[in-house]
Amino acid sequence: MNERIRIREILAGTPAGTEVIVKGWVRTSRVGKGVAFLAVNDGSCLASLQVVAEPGLANYHELRGIGTGAAVAVRGIVAESPAAGQAVELHATKVVVVGGADEQYPLQKKRHTFEYLRTIAHLRPRSNTFGAVFRVRSSLAQAVHRFFAERGFLYVHTPIITTSDCEGAGELFRVTTLDPSAPPMADGAVDFSQDFFAAQAGLTVSGQLEGELFAQAFSDIYTFGPTFRAENSNTPRHAAEFWMIEPEMAFADLRDDAALAEDFFRYLCRHVLDNCAEDMAFFNEHVDRGLLARVEQVAGSSFAMMEYGVAIEHLKRAAVPFEYPVEWGLDLQTEHERYLTEQVVGGPVFVVNYPQEIKAFYMRRNDDGRTVAAMDLLVPKVGEIIGGSQREERYDLLESRMREGGIAPESLWWYLDSRRWGSTPHAGFGLGFERLIMYLTGMENIRDVIPFPRTPRHAEF
């Protein structure tokens, strides 16, 4: 029984009378009118295939008592189903129990909380909700690559281990081969010159800086890989390990950046609506009732643009109390972002040109001397989902911004050096892949959209 067909293909239109082999796991089983019914799922789609096992099978008595979670291989004939809700079923001619499952199997037929399912992350992909989440995640990852490939962007693999902190926040996970119980010392401090890389190294927080270097050779590039933040945060929106999508474009300014971000985000919204319809309908029914309407609205809308200063004025005039203060020079909080996108604009909006004091050193200083060419894309329900900027291409101003931010220019000499020869205006943005999945599925905790979440004090599996 080697030639198998995926259940998705059978349900999509395999003609009645066709002999097929399916392999999967029993979701439910029941006995009625002298036959056993097994609902078998192979992960290829949300729906299970009903297998009808009749008493003539050699192991019929075994199948009558088969447990939820058992793995089976089934040979049978596709037949039109008399039951409501399914077009076809499989009349088994042979069923092999590949791997049994007793009543101790944790995913019995009942509703489990997401909190409980996190404790059995090795099994939760077998549930309906997480099967849908990870099918959508896979499809979106493929869509990301397709979007950029169609537009001629080069895919760049940036390093996981780095000696630089792109955001300057000091949230690196350290990588060392030194003996923690007896590290070499020099002048009262750990002597990292004796470490593997002869310097302090850590896991990357972003591939942006290296991506910029490649944009100065290939014009349009993107990175898509894991990033790490040693941030001791236990919110539903933060994880220590997550994936980032970071395009960079040479010969581009902030408006070019916003245009790419809008095209990209709308493309991904349309992709899940068109290619993940069954799973999206499941999320709309069981996770977030307004999901489909919201994603459809974003996919079909044009995004607004608003100056940071104008956004502050809107917030000051708001007839609702905010938990966090609103003043020019303060960063926007989620409550402010949601008010702007939901109440002021009624759809997605780019907020642009932020005070330089609250943004990163690499963002291009505007001519007013107070703001930088930064942008955040705000969307209903979640607030900020994309952050980007035009990068500072002028050597002297970049060096000055680094010193102002307490970053030693010599520590990023190569980044500065790229501005010496053939420097061009360039821009890019970052989109957290998990936050994208949360937005497009309605899942409210980042731990539930990544296979094995890494958060403070949790690194199991």
From Swiss-Prot:
Gene3D superfamilies: Bira Bifunctional Protein, Domain 2, Nucleic acid-binding proteins. Its EC number is 6.1.1.22. The keyword Acyltransferase does not apply. One of its GO terms (cellular component) is cytoplasm. It catalyses: tRNA(Asn) + L-asparagine + ATP = L-asparaginyl-tRNA(Asn) + AMP + diphosphate + H(+). GO terms for molecular function: asparagine-tRNA ligase activity; ATP binding; nucleic acid binding. It is found in: Cytoplasm. Its main location: cytoplasm. Keywords: Aminoacyl-tRNA synthetase, ATP-binding, Cytoplasm, Ligase, Nucleotide-binding, Protein biosynthesis. Pfam families: tRNA-synt_2, tRNA_anti-codon. It is an enzyme of class 6 (ligase). One of its GO terms (biological process) is asparaginyl-tRNA aminoacylation. SUPFAM superfamilies: Class II aaRS and biotin synthetases (SSF55681), Nucleic acid-binding proteins (SSF50249). Belongs to the class-II aminoacyl-tRNA synthetase family. Homodimer. This is Asparagine--tRNA ligase. It comes from Geobacter sulfurreducens (strain ATCC 51573 / DSM 12127 / PCA). The lineage of its organism: Bacteria, Pseudomonadati, Thermodesulfobacteriota, Desulfuromonadia, Geobacterales. The gene is asnS.
